[in-house]
């Protein structure tokens, strides 16, 4: 085989004058754009599933929200978010459709009404109240807590009518008294009922050198 001839390497850049080159450093390192790759859609990816109870959704099948083992009926919970954060409430049951927790203050002790809350926003304590005598009416479900929109689609100015404030209905007040009555009776029968009334009536707070991850609730 005939070997390759050692040809001299001639650079494209050369001195036009002392200290002045023909091409700059950025000009020599210029790289042309490459062809854009074609996008192929990945059809193997599965659609995410919504963790909801009840009806099926378009993105996937519904999944039952599992309840934490520490959340049993009668457990005293500490609310972590919302206007009532820090208050101690009594857990009644889990609503089947949404998976939210049905809790009450009772309202007479700490002003916490009958309402729903997610289990991610509560801390379960070791204290329990006997709620075996509580009978929750059948109409108290997820639809019961949904507020009806008062806005009407009209051509009038929406700012002229002013803001409509929410008012508690008489039916809601009656239901709160019905549910809270047996709970108050069970607290009064407790050997340490004075402590329970004071415990439920005060908000939870952290003092100096108190760390929640080191506390036993």
Curated annotation (Swiss-Prot):
Matching InterPro entries: 60S_ribosomal_eL6 (IPR000915), Rib_uL2_dom2 (IPR014722), Ribosomal_eL6_CS (IPR049633), Ribosomal_eL6_KOW (IPR041997), Translation_prot_SH3-like_sf (IPR008991)
Assigned keywords, A-Z: Cytoplasm, Endoplasmic reticulum, Ribonucleoprotein, Ribosomal protein
Gene Ontology terms: biological process: cytoplasmic translation; determination of adult lifespan
PANTHER family documented for this protein: 60S RIBOSOMAL PROTEIN L6, LARGE RIBOSOMAL SUBUNIT PROTEIN EL6
Localisation: Cytoplasm, Cytosol; Cytoplasm; Rough endoplasmic reticulum
Subunit structure: Component of the large ribosomal subunit. May bind IPO9 with low affinity.
Role, per record: Component of the large ribosomal subunit.
GO molecular function list: RNA binding; structural constituent of ribosome
Lineage: superkingdom: Eukaryota
Name of the protein in question: Large ribosomal subunit protein eL6
Family: Belongs to the eukaryotic ribosomal protein eL6 family.
Organism: Caenorhabditis elegans
Pfam families from the UniProt entry: Ribosomal_L6e
Gene Ontology cellular component annotations, sorted alphabetically: cytosolic large ribosomal subunit; rough endoplasmic reticulum
